[in-house]
Amino acid sequence: MKKYPISHYKKSGSSLFVNGGTLTVTDSECLVEYLNKEVVRFSLWDTVVTKASSELLYEGIRLTHDGQSIDLYFPKMGKTIRELREHFHMTD
């Protein structure tokens, strides 16, 4: 299990900006916790495309929720996980 420190959560519209708490990555899922409370849990497949992208979980990632699914935006790459999956030709 890998844990990535994040500094604070704040909501802005439908986006959750992750700046605090802990993002835990297991073999099957990711869990974001803040103040020991589960904030959001989602499939690892939707979150980490490659080892390279998993290493980019750092302050500034943005979690977005469209009502059905959650996506992560990586500022350094300027792409979301969905875009990365499309780039690597990965499908559901």
Regions found by a protein language model. Name each.
Residues 1-23, 83:
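Anionic N-terminal interaction surfaces
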Residues 2, 39-92:
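Acidic, Ser/Thr- and proline-rich intrinsically disordered linker/docking segments
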Residues 9, 33-35, 64:
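A generic structural motif
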